[in-house]
Amino acid sequence: ASDAPYTSSLGSVSISGVSLEWSAYLGTPDTFTGSFECSDEDLTQWWYDGVYTVDMGTDVFLANETEPRSASSPTLEGKQVLFDGAKRDRDPYVGDLAVASLTSYLSHDFAKSSRSVLEDLAQHQRSDGWIPPASINNYGLPLFDYPLWWVVCSVDLVMYTGNTSYANTYWNTLKKALDGYYAANTDSATGLLYKNDTGYGDYAFLPRSGPVTYYNALYVHALSYASQLATSLGLNDDAERWSSRASSVGKALLSHNFDQSVGAFYDGGPCPGAAAGTYCNVHSQDGNSIAILAGVTNDTTSAQILDYWQNATSQGYGNAFYDSSILSPGDQFNSRVYAFISYFEIAARFATPGQASSAFDELRRLYGWMASHDPQITMWEGIGPSGAPYEGAFTSMAHGWSTGVVPLLTGYVLGVKPQSPGFKTWRICPVVDGGGLAWAKGEVPTPQGKIEVSWERDNVQTGVIFTLNIETPDGSSGVVCVPTLGLDNPTISMDGAAVNVSSDPTSGWASVDAAGGKHVFTVEA
């Protein structure tokens, strides 16, 4: 060739140095305001792996680095946001925040990335009250459930961070979603939400229509949670209206959608090609789990649902999100596991008396599988048949919605949850049975300072078989649930003095009111 003196098929390149620009949130020891540790090293590691997964997805929204399907948005440009995944899709979806934001609040107390997303979506609310799920498709992706997740995540933001100014600013947005959009999509004959079209409408892009259990259970949850916040803010009319509606929808859901033959809720819509108004013989993890957490079912029915689900869907890598693939046979729904929705099932197990062992079992199967397979330190978007990434190489392997292990361990094993904005009131109800744990300790950030909790099982020979230490901010108050450990009449002491409390053998706890400050609780046989 004419350029032969100047080119060659062989050669070498010398590199004198390599550097990496880390643009995501850099979690270092000094940025952690929350923590978790327990006697099971795996659980401890998974808590921090979950935080790292969310750190990787926390970044500045830039037009040339985000989802290419018309997701670039000048109202988000340059803001800290919480993306759904570190590499894919690189767009902040509000449903993902239902888990990912909790992980962020409980680890670094970093709310800016979540607030940016929630505020931006509120500002794009449609005139009928619908709120877009993300900026993708020019804020036009037609998901039916995500306005409810906006409500839930907005309440989370206020409860965990104390940002009541956000609530005041966007209260009418919240009301318009609950009282406008969803009220207009309610079947007056049944009192249930009814999705008319069969196009995709939720987090998994499922072809569901009709009085779908998941949509209605999530509606009950959103109404109840918004009512709780309204009460804290002194908005009693809103609180009463939403609480009443939540109760009515919950009763209608039990009346119309519960399948007595298996002891679980139907998915709620027709089978493919079947007539509208019929119920397909299929059941889903999302609706059943959230119905339990929303208080639709009593403890007996909740346990019945959870026992069925364990028997019908258990895999070595978690529990599948459907008990059948009839809605889309080629997609093998009965072998697909979403850690996102599994969060709600595991939470339902922790919240249901007698189900703690199954909660720890599912937690260990799910997160143990991801931790023992490449990349080992981040949580996957979804798991498919045989435990492989559910969309092959296209699967996001660092997805914030899959980090439920963080709020599960903090919210149930430590037992710390806010009851009013900014943890001004709180509950500390640790689940100490079922997981084989000898001790656990950790910290939870609040606007007034940290809540510190540690508990341990003691040597039975000393007479004291359990000790719980808490320290909460001055001026706060709450309820402490002291585990009775199966004892019929234990001696429970608070700060060295016996307290006269009645224990509930069903829940396995004795409830004690406590003011802020340091307290030590002991249980003696």
Language-model region placement:
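Catalytic cores of carbohydrate-active enzymes
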Residues: 64-82, 86-95, 99, 132, ...
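Structural helix-adjacent loops and short alpha-helical linkers that scaffold large soluble proteins
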Residues: 4-11, 41-43, 105-119, 125, ...
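Substrate-binding groove/exosite segments of carbohydrate-active enzymes
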Residues: 1, 12-181, 285-288, 336-340, ...
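Surface-exposed interaction regions enriched in Ser/Thr/Asp/Glu
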Residues: 2-21, 517-525
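Extracytoplasmic low-complexity repetitive segments enriched in small/polar residues
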Residues: 4-5, 17-24, 32, 36-38, ...
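Short, hydrophobic/amphipathic alpha-helical patches that form generic packing surfaces
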Residues: 102-107, 291-295, 407-411
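Non-catalytic C-terminal accessory modules of carbohydrate-active enzymes
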Residues: 356-525
